[in-house]
């Protein structure tokens, strides 16, 4: 299977280029009016900087802002499953300079660049070069090959999916978030590393086609392109395997927009579907699903961590036996996010969703997780078995770390609600509320957030995050009970 990947990559590359070279055949009799391009295509690709628009505007768009955020963390007093390390950080601070520019180089060529430079401090962290992190989020060239056909080459943040809290078809999201600046999935998807790829897009009156080929790049450790200390490209996060994506959008039905995706990762196939349906002027129903070949979360987490020889909070010798095991069978497993959005006349939009992850932990696996954690705690309290206890607990907490970095639910059944109120109560005050519940153990996460815009350049924000539930539950077992985050953004 793996030996055929170079051939597959060459075929995919040829297909991507053909979109640009043979676009006219894709749109026999097409009206080239740009209003026919679906909004979700424009929002994620270079067509935003089209030559027609650029001729009446500046040849570039530049956005620069400074973000200063401080966070206070409040520890849960008693943990059923302790972490391997007792270095709980009670505070952290991040100041970031974020730059994004889109430049029209010629009538047919554009250049896009997005970068974030951050200085991060937290309790127990000694000042060093590791406090400084640079994330090159996007850098790519766009060729307007013909009419509404585009080819992108470089690091691109490809975003897929119609849901708000969990996107099963957002196939390039895994490990792409380097700094968790928010618990809001819609914010994280805009602030992550792109993937090095070549992407071709063709848009016509009744639909759109996108092809992506993303090669595996050597992820030998401690190289400038893999350095994870803050100065490298971190391609081990975004290009660790060869991946292909084909996406076809149909725009022929009134108020019904189907989108079909086919994705190959490391030789394994996945099929995805996005479907939206307008129900009147205020309600949009949607479903997003994916089915593909994979092991479960437990197995994938332990395989990944054992291969690297590192846990999120401790280090263990290679070959350490797994404290807990999942189903290592590679078979078809499905994920889904289904729900609706409701927008009222008072600038309030509420999304209610059900999330399903077949690869997530079942109630029985959660019981095994807590049972193994109790045993690890006993070993940790005994000096003779302390090292073993740390390794056991490290394996257990690596599962939590993996699910967070993979941006997928750790449990199988989740309820998600997000409400956004623009100009709430007073002008320029925006309120956001997020509620997420594990439907099996009834533990939940809740986040109220307020953002006040001081003119056009400055925004003040205040957010609280609460992780609540019984001691032996998903959210009730986390080290953090709650935290508060205050920030200020200044746009130049």
Question: What role is predicted for each listed range?
Answer:
Residues 102-218, 250, 469:
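Outer membrane beta-barrel
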Residues 255, 276-436:
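Detector for outer-membrane/organellar transmembrane beta-barrel domains
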Residues 68-78, 115-121, 157-159, 204-206, ...:
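Transmembrane beta-strands of outer-membrane beta-barrel pores
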Residues 95-103, 138-143, 198-202, 246-250, ...:
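Residues on the lipid-exposed face of transmembrane beta-strands in outer-membrane beta-barrel proteins
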């Amino acid at each position: 299977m793996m030996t055929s990947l170079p051939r597959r990559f060459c075929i995919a590359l040829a297909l991507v280029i053909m979109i640009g070279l043979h676009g006219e055949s894709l749109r026999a009799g097409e009206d080239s009016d740009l209003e026919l391009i679906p909004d979700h295509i424009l929002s994620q690709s270079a067509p935003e900087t089209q030559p027609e628009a650029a001729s009446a505007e500046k040849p570039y768009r530049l956005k620069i802002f400074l973000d200063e955020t401080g966070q206070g963390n409040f520890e849960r007093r008693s943990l059923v499953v302790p972490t391997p390390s007792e270095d709980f950080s009670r505070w952290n601070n991040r100041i970031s300079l974020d730059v994004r520019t889109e430049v029209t180089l010629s009538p047919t060529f554009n250049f896009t660049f997005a970068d974030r430079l951050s200085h991060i401090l937290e309790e127990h962290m000694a000042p060093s070069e590791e406090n400084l992190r640079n994330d090159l989020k996007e850098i790519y060239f766009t060729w307007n090959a013909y009419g509404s056909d585009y080819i992108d080459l470089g690091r691109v943040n490809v975003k897929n999916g119609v849901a708000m809290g969990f996107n099963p078809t957002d196939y390039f999201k895994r490990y792409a978030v380097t700094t968790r600046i928010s618990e809001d999935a819609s914010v994280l998807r805009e602030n992550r590393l792109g993937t090095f790829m070549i992407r071709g897009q063709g848009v016509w009156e009744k639909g759109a086609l996108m092809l992506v080929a993303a090669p595996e790049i050597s992820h030998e450790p401690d190289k400038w392109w893999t350095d994870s200390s803050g100065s490298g490209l971190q391609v081990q996060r975004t290009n660790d395997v060869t991946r292909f994506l084909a996406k076809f959008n149909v725009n022929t039905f009134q108020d019904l927009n189907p989108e079909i995706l086919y994705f190959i990762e490391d030789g394994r196939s996945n099929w995805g579907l996005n479907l939206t349906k307008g129900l009147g002027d205020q309600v949009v129903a949607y479903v997003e699903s994916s089915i593909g070949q994979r092991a479960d979360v437990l197995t994938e987490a332990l395989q990944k961590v054992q291969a690297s020889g590192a846990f999120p909070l401790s280090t263990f010798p290679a070959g350490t036996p797994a404290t807990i095991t999942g189903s290592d069978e590679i078979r078809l497993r499905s994920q889904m996010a289904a729900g609706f959005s409701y927008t009222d006349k008072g600038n309030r939009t509420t999304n209610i969703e059900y999330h399903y992850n077949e690869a997530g932990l079942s109630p029985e696996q959660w019981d095994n997780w807590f049972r193994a954690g109790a045993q690890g705690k006993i070993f940790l309290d005994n000096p003779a078995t302390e090292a073993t206890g740390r390794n056991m607990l490290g394996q257990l907490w690596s599962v939590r770390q993996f699910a967070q970095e993979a941006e997928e639910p750790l449990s199988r059944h989740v309820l998600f609600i997000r409400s956004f109120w623009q100009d709430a109560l007073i002008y320029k005050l925006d309120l956001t509320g997020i509620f997420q519940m594990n439907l099996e153990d009834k533990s939940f996460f809740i986040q109220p957030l307020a953002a006040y815009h001081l003119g056009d350049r400055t925004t003040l924000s205040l957010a609280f995050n609460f992780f609540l539930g019984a001691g032996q539950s998903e959210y009730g077992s986390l080290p953090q009970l709650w935290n508060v985050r205050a920030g200020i953004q200044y746009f130049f």
